[in-house]
Swiss-Prot record:
GO terms classed as biological process: cholesterol biosynthetic process; sterol biosynthetic process; triterpenoid biosynthetic process
Sequence similarity: Belongs to the terpene cyclase/mutase family.
Organism: Dictyostelium discoideum (Social amoeba)
PANTHER family attached to this UniProt entry: LANOSTEROL SYNTHASE, TERPENE CYCLASE/MUTASE FAMILY MEMBER
Entries under NCBIfam families matching the protein: squalene_cyclas
PFTB repeats mapped onto the chain: 59-103, 106-148, 461-503, 539-579, 587-628, 645-686
Protein name from the UniProt record: Cycloartenol synthase
Residues of the active site: D435 (proton donor)
Amino acid sequence: MTTTNWSLKVDRGRQTWEYSQEKKEATDVDIHLLRLKEPGTHCPEGCDLNRAKTPQQAIKKAFQYFSKVQTEDGHWAGDYGGPMFLLPGLVITCYVTGYQLPESTQREIIRYLFNRQNPVDGGWGLHIEAHSDIFGTTLQYVSLRLLGVPADHPSVVKARTFLLQNGGATGIPSWGKFWLATLNAYDWNGLNPIPIEFWLLPYNLPIAPGRWWCHCRMVYLPMSYIYAKKTTGPLTDLVKDLRREIYCQEYEKINWSEQRNNISKLDMYYEHTSLLNVINGSLNAYEKVHSKWLRDKAIDYTFDHIRYEDEQTKYIDIGPVNKTVNMLCVWDREGKSPAFYKHADRLKDYLWLSFDGMKMQGYNGSQLWDTAFTIQAFMESGIANQFQDCMKLAGHYLDISQVPEDARDMKHYHRHYSKGAWPFSTVDHGWPISDCTAEGIKSALALRSLPFIEPISLDRIADGINVLLTLQNGDGGWASYENTRGPKWLEKFNPSEVFQNIMIDYSYVECSAACIQAMSAFRKHAPNHPRIKEINRSIARGVKFIKSIQRQDGSWLGSWGICFTYGTWFGIEGLVASGEPLTSPSIVKACKFLASKQRADGGWGESFKSNVTKEYVQHETSQVVNTGWALLSLMSAKYPDRECIERGIKFLIQRQYPNGDFPQESIIGVFNFNCMISYSNYKNIFPLWALSRYNQLYLKSKI
């Protein structure tokens, strides 16, 4: 019997890890997620440890295993960690506000930080596979010290050595400067302004915050509040020690105004434009003479928006950065109020435990997203009817995750329509997303063919289609959460230094192709729907957009996965679903591109450096997820070179573990081009999906 102190609890998608002083028998889900057994050796009921030799055997084993690690509310839980700059915000917020994390949680966070330390130079990077930099190293160092790790601990000494040898914490990027300032370990005069008065600008101005990408908007909203108030934690003995430890000169002798644009070369990815530097200079001058009346008005206005975001998301907030900064704002405004404790309770939603320790995820999970893909993979296997309980549960989660109504006062708070949409994670989170809605629609429609499932009504699915129709941009494409509201030149104001394309919500091939697929599937189920002509026009415009952004080599640049393999999978699937002829030059070129990247072992492997450089970079080894995407693309397009496809299928069968699981390989997700993020369920979903499609397309064998 395998035992554990930790177990995952779920409730309508909410995931929380609970600690017990006494070890308890581990569930299949716990064993899978925590790797309590050697990978490939855990054998849930109904599985065996005989290696698959045929595609049909591999499909059956993959389905059997993955169905056993489904949570009791129907979703598939997974690790959505990877970024290293998130957890320190939580640790600093708890320290500043005096909120005590449980000792068991603190131990696991410390274990994670040590496990993810670069063994060569002692630093940390922007994400778990990145080179060490000042942002990552400073914030993890500070976190370890705040959590009680002494300054003379060998790993801490090694990190401090790296930090000081590379210029110290004065070269940390702006988000790091912000967190250090709130801790009282950095002077507010060393930051470029985060002008809270911007929030009073009318929406008809192109630079108004309501026109920004929602993640950018919701991060800089509470940051501007904290900057305006100069909210700062107490100057404790530990903070005084940190002031001595992380800088290359005495804290009191640092010229803080000279540090505003001091960003280490190790960190710099997106440099400030000349225009931004001029504006920052003007804002620094304004900061000295700002109107108190106007600032107080802006503070009240922004806190109202912060409160709205908290309440609409049940204190989850759109993401982990504004989650912790919002919590800090509530503490500054109200102290340890009921709202503060609602915030504190929702910290658990972001903390994820895995084999390497406890991390902060890039969202409150990827529950709906992973479940929708899993449903589609299972449906294409041809054996979904053999796993009725699993499919019923998955359908249940899809059902309870659809957003039932629009957010209140949408226009005032810059929100888009929500009714009928699907979120990335949970209905409590509730932010509608174009491709999540599309995948939800596709999954709901696919499940209608199973007679033992209570289907989601076509009226409810049509609500989702309505959201997609409102989200289409003028260029024919779809962005992520909202329409593109601002001009592209707003990117000249990007102050982040480490991310690109943060200022507005751009049209993406992934979102556009997913929406085309969803609407194409819907019109087959509802050919006489009142909006069918609009749907047809929307699909045609979307196809034109996808073709317009295809690169000369036939690929599409992925913005949410790695990278050209991912983007090209969406590009091909979108065109094929729309009815584009398979002889279309766009499809032929795309297939040729993918085939040219196949490796000697039959697989595909793409490095995250493709996203960073925007040029295809081969990984050191083939990856099961990249291989799954490439094979799905080629088979969707009926690529004529069957040998190419069969070599990929053989690679997947060889890589499958005897129990039906697949190996966790390199990081596979990305956002804003420079930061990678984990999708641990992808290793199970996409190989199974590719194997299933191969069997349906070529073998047509019963399993």
